[in-house]
């Protein structure tokens, strides 16, 4: 990711899955992710809400939205198949909420970068509360709506390999909402694809899909959860 490029259109946003081959200068900078200037902090306990509603892929993020159901991006899910595994709210070497197999993948039919996955309820490797997925995680709820200047947070796994799968929280504000696109200034990096965007009540208003990894950027993007998108997601939540 070249940080000197000015992104001039939403179509040019870089997707935020983590990639190998990052040069040494970028790695050195990203190792300083949790500093005050970026408004990024490492999550101290991923076993409490809302942090226990976030899951990790090997190079991206997702979050729980209902029984055995998680949301991420299409550009994340395209690299996965039924039977592949996700990890519930890992916390570096402190443990995680269990490892689970993907049961089904349903991409949103429009252009929006959303994918819904159903997860096998029984873990391959158990979490602290046993083998049941729903006992080790807590689903996030939809926000009714959102508006410009609302305070938000993004929770996820930026640069997961480099950061040893530690969870981070980034705070900022909504800069604009147009149709199903939400722009915000919270700091994000590769690996944040699929992260939930939460309001001050820890309700989810969208899913991160891209940005430029620059402090103060107002071009970071998420799919805003319109009524139509919420309806699609609700239909794919396991009953």
From Swiss-Prot:
Range of residues in the leader sequence: 1-36
Any Pfam family: Trypsin
Compartment(s) of residence: Secreted
One cellular component term from this protein's GO annotations in UniProt: extracellular region
BP GO annotations: proteolysis
Active-site annotation: 75, 113, 193
Entry GO MF terms: serine-type endopeptidase activity
Primary location: secreted
EC number annotated for this UniProt entry: 3.4.21.-
UniProt entry keywords in alphabetical sequence: Hydrolase, Protease, Secreted, Serine protease, Signal
Top EC category: hydrolase
Family that this chain belongs to: Belongs to the peptidase S1B family.
Listed name of the protein: Serine protease SplC
Organism name: Staphylococcus aureus (strain MSSA476)
């Amino acid at each position: 990711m070249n940080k000197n490029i000015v992104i001039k259109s939403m179509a040019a946003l870089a997707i935020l899955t983590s990639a190998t081959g990052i040069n040494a200068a970028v790695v050195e900078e990203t190792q300083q992710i949790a500093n005050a200037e970026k408004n990024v902090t490492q999550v101290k306990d991923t076993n409490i809400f809302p942090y226990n509603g976030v899951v990790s892929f090997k190079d991206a993020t997702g979050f729980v939205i209902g029984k055995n159901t998680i949301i991420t991006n299409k550009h994340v899910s395209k690299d996965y198949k039924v039977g592949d595994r996700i990890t519930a709210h890992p916390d570096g070497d402190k443990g995680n909420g269990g490892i689970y197999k993907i049961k089904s993948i349903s991409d949103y039919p429009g252009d929006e970068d959303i994918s819904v996955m159903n997860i096998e309820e029984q873990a391959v490797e158990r979490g602290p509360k046993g083998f049941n997925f729903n006992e080790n995680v807590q689903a996030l709820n939809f926000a009714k709506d959102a508006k410009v200047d609302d305070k938000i947070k993004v929770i996820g796994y930026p640069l997961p390999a480099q950061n040893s799968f530690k969870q981070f929280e980034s705070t900022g504000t909504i800069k604009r909402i147009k149709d199903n696109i939400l722009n915000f200034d919270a700091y994000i990096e590769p690996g944040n694809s699929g992260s939930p965007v939460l309001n001050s009540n820890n309700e989810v208003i969208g899913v991160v899909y891209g940005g430029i990894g620059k402090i103060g950027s107002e071009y970071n993007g998420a799919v805003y959860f319109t009524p139509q998108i919420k309806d699609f997601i609700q239909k794919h939540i396991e009953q």
